[in-house]
């Protein structure tokens, strides 16, 4: 199932300027999600990272993956109305820079889901090429 930005805002508490997802292309609650982030030159971070050579910081790619994973978790009926907090990060790797004009495709597969936590593997791609990956842990509250 696809989600619009309005539907994403019904699931996640994040708002501008920190809601990093523009759309969810597919979500299977409790299993996986595919989301998009359109990287634009107007994003405030590019004023300082880096002037004349804008590059999306890796931490924002990881946060985008975490928000996508949170959608997969919080779409489950038992977690409706809850918040997913970042609980941990392992094996993060960055393979290519992300710049204005890129569209990040964010894929997260949930590997474990418990009553108060979840774990997943995330991959971020641009034009079909892997730009980042990480294992993510979520705490649900």
From Swiss-Prot:
One Pfam family, short name: FabA
Keyword Coiled coil listed: no
Keywords, sorted A to Z: Cytoplasm, Lipid A biosynthesis, Lipid biosynthesis, Lipid metabolism, Lyase
Primary role: Involved in unsaturated fatty acids biosynthesis. Catalyzes the dehydration of short chain beta-hydroxyacyl-ACPs and long chain saturated and unsaturated beta-hydroxyacyl-ACPs.
Main location: cytoplasm
Enzyme class name: lyase
Catalytic activities: a (3R)-hydroxyacyl-[ACP] = a (2E)-enoyl-[ACP] + H2O
Organism, scientific name: Enterococcus faecalis (strain ATCC 700802 / V583)
GO cellular component, one term: cytoplasm
Gene that produces this protein: fabZ2
UniProt similarity note: Belongs to the thioester dehydratase family. FabZ subfamily.
SUPFAM superfamilies in the record: Thioesterase/thiol ester dehydrase-isomerase
EC number, as in UniProt: 4.2.1.59
Active site: 49
Domain of life: Bacteria
Protein name: 3-hydroxyacyl-[acyl-carrier-protein] dehydratase FabZ
An MF annotation (GO) of this entry: (3R)-hydroxyacyl-[acyl-carrier-protein] dehydratase activity
GO terms for biological process, alphabetical: fatty acid biosynthetic process; lipid A biosynthetic process
Regions crossing the membrane: none
Location of this chain's protein in the cell: Cytoplasm
């Amino acid at each position: 199932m696809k989600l619009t930005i309005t539907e994403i805002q019904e699931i996640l508490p994040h708002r501008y300027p920190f809601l990093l997802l523009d759309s969810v292309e597919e979500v299977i609650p409790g299993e996986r999600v595919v989301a998009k982030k359109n990287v634009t030159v107007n994003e405030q971070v590019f004023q300082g990272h880096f002037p004349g050579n804008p590059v999306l910081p890796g931490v924002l790619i990881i946060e985008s993956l975490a928000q996508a994973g949170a959608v997969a978790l919080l779409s489950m009926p038992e977690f409706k109305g809850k918040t997913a907090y970042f609980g941990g990060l392992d094996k993060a790797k960055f393979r290519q820079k992300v710049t204005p004009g890129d569209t990040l495709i964010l894929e997260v597969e949930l590997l474990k889901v418990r009553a108060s936590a979840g774990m997943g593997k995330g991959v971020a791609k641009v034009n079909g090429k892997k730009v980042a990956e990480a294992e993510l842990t979520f705490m649900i509250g």
